A protein has these predicted regions:
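Alpha-helical transmembrane segments and their immediate juxtamembrane cytosolic regions
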Residues: 1-178
Length: 178
């Protein structure tokens, strides 16, 4: 959690420089969204696994704890949307969704594809049809193939290289195109 927070801070300036070529709007980078998504997962686990008892029925208490576990995820998603985190509520919801379905890959794929179609379908309803929404929907759905095929084994230990890639490539693109 701390590592994601630190990389969110480090990556913010390169992100703002790159983003300034396209818009004057302020937003937080993807590491901020990943940080908030992980925080939502940690809070969900903490709340849903707590031993808070409303009644003597353990199954009922467990169900209530799980339901209350969703509250921080929803609130953090709303905060992400209001505070202009990259991908906003959608980003936090998808991170949480992947965690929630971590042991059910087929369920994850079905839910994710359905969520993508609904998201871009709503955009078409609100803003009118544009082929770009179809391309965005397809581009959003395609990565689920790689997620589905992931075998759960850690790859080469190049974690910090991958972390560094994000701000470095944004700076390179900024200086090349500015």
């Amino acid at each position: 959690l701390l590592r994601l927070f630190c990389f969110a801070i480090i990556s913010q300036v390169p992100f703002m420089l790159f983003d300034s070529m396209f818009t004057n709007n302020f937003s937080f980078n993807i590491f901020g969204t990943l940080f908030v998504g992980l925080l939502a997962i940690l809070l969900y686990d903490k709340i849903s696994n707590c031993t808070f008892e409303l009644t003597k029925d353990k199954k009922f208490n467990l169900t209530i704890n799980k339901i209350f576990g969703f509250v921080p995820a929803i609130l953090l998603g709303i905060i992400s949307e209001v505070c202009y985190f990259d991908y906003g509520f959608w980003g936090v919801a998808i991170i949480f969704l992947f965690y929630f379905f971590k042991n059910d890959k087929l369920g994850m794929v079905i839910f994710y594809i359905t969520a993508c179609i609904i998201k871009y379908g709503i955009n078409i309803i609100i803003y009118g049809y544009h082929y770009l929404y179809i391309l965005l929907c397809i581009g959003t759905i395609l990565p689920i193939i790689f997620i589905y095929l992931y075998n759960g084994k850690q790859g080469k230990k190049i974690k910090y290289l991958l972390y560094a890639f994000y701000p470095v490539h944004l700076l390179i693109l900024y200086f090349v195109f500015k």
